[in-house]
Amino acid sequence: ALKSNLLYDATTTINLGFETALAEKWTFDLSGNWNPFQFEDNMKWKHWLIQPEFRYWTCRKFGGHFFAAHLLGGQYNFGNLDGLPNFLGSDLSQLADHRYEGWYAGAGVGYGYAWMLGKHWNLEAEIGVGAAYTNFEKYECPKCGKLVGTDDHIYYGLTKLAINLVYLF
């Protein structure tokens, strides 16, 4: 199957997923996301992410309920983003005055459901929670010049949120 996460599409993030059957109720999903764009006023939401995932389907593969275990890793360059809230222990409001550049790696578990739309089309929803370690450099904004410092952080919370449009071969 090939898939696209409509939530990533809404954030201008290019994404593509591939899923293949491993056994009667098991599949392997691999998704990749990339956002190379810089917007006006030096606003950045640049990142890439790779997320491999094993899924166990309770009825049959590619239909109904599934449970998942996933890994995630990537790099980011975020900054000059106004109006973001505090979310799950992360103070996203700091992205208004600073730029963060770093990498992350983590793991999580998820639950999802796939609705059959037709012979070759599914709509799939999934939510995942877990943890991710990140190491980053913090820069001044809005011109993002001077290095303020380096730090690391362990994030606990959402590690996957997807509404996928799926094409089945």
Task: Please annotate each region the language model reported.
Residues 22-24, 52-60, 112-117, 167-169:
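Outer-membrane beta-barrel proteins
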Residues 4, 18, 30-32, 52, ...:
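Membrane-embedded beta-strand positions of outer-membrane beta-barrel proteins
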Residues 25-28, 62, 120-123:
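Repeated loop/turn-to-beta-strand initiation elements of outer-membrane beta-barrel proteins
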Residues 3-17, 35-46, 61:
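Solvent-exposed loop/turn segments connecting transmembrane beta-strands
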Residues 155-169:
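Outer-membrane beta-barrel "beta-signal"
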Residues 6-10, 32-38, 56-58, 71-77, ...:
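Transmembrane beta-strands of outer-membrane beta-barrel pores
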Residues 33-47, 75-103, 135-154:
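Flexible, solvent-exposed loop segments that connect beta-strands
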Residues 1, 11-13, 47-51, 102-108, ...:
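Transmembrane beta-barrel architecture of outer-membrane proteins
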